[in-house]
Swiss-Prot record:
Name by which UniProt lists this protein: tRNA uridine(34) hydroxylase
SUPFAM superfamilies associated with the record: Rhodanese/Cell cycle control phosphatase
PROSITE patterns assigned: RHODANESE_3 (PS50206)
Gene: trhO
PANTHER family: RHODANESE-LIKE DOMAIN-CONTAINING PROTEIN 7-RELATED, THIOSULFATE SULFURTRANSFERASE/RHODANESE-LIKE DOMAIN-CONTAINING PROTEIN 2
Entry keyword annotation includes Electron transport: no
Keywords: Oxidoreductase, tRNA processing
Catalytic site: C177
EC code: 1.14.-.-
Source organism of this protein record: Staphylococcus aureus (strain NCTC 8325 / PS 47)
NCBIfam families reported in the protein's UniProt record: PRK00142.1-3 (NF001135)
Gene Ontology BP annotations: tRNA modification
Family: Belongs to the TrhO family.
InterPro entries, per the entry: Rhodanese-like_dom, Rhodanese-like_dom_sf, Rhodanese_C, TrhO, TRHO_N
Domain of life: Bacteria
Amino acid sequence: MNYQVLLYYKYMTIDDPEQFAQDHLAFCKAHHLKGRILVSTEGINGTLSGTKEETEQYMAHMHADERFKDMVFKIDEAEGHAFKKMHVRPRKEIVALDLEDDVDPRHTTGQYLSPVEFRKALEDDDTVIIDARNDYEFDLGHFRGAIRPNITRFRDLPDWIKENKALFADKKVVTYCTGGIRCEKFSGWLLKEGFEDVAQLHGGIATYGKDPETKGEYWDGKMYVFDDRISVDINQVEKTIIGKDWFDGKPCERYINCANPECNKQILVSEENETKYLGACSYECAKHERNRYVQANNISDNEWQQRLTNFDDLHQHA
């Protein structure tokens, strides 16, 4: 495989995010890179793809900058680009938690746990493990015994914690996310909320899966990623599928977006059921006049109406 996907972040000061974004986009395009990078006054958060040569040049370029000289890159091999375009966007935050009283992870953040230390925490009955990702990420794969917050956006996590505080009272709390960036800020927020014993998986699931000692042990399913790959394997010890098809509940790890552009809900669904239910999550979405599956597959009105009858006897799970 001649391509690589890079995942990285760093909390540090960028004085002029707008100018930085403009210059950085030009550099990335000149090196034929594709991906998504967010920059703000609090730092940088990026994931991009390119050939090995181009991504190595990018990392060398970043490490040559005093501000990014110690930035850690998580690297996956790939068969081609994981993105279709290149975006570098200035933002208020590099992860959107939208707190009234913001947290600076450079000053307030949970204790860092190495993959081996995190594995011990997973084995400790007195430790609560919180998945800091969204529900659809959790449903594709997660650490065994982890708590699933019922959220679809990271910014909703603090409210969910407040509503369920009894679950974590007087417990050691350990949190994890994809690459570590969300936990840097979330664990700091937990400390400010009065939780005393707070830790985080340093480098996230991506680092844990590549660790030569842990080898992704205790991870079930796949890890959701925000690029064209959709998911990657983590557990090198044993393979399990925990995802369930939206319609029939059978084991499934195939995510699609609902074909109704006004819904766009992410659902796990087999190719067979995608065809059967017109790429939609519900009858209402399947019959939507702008159904993308119907348009992309040139389905006739008669065939459309015929397939809609597949919903008649369907009892969807929640």
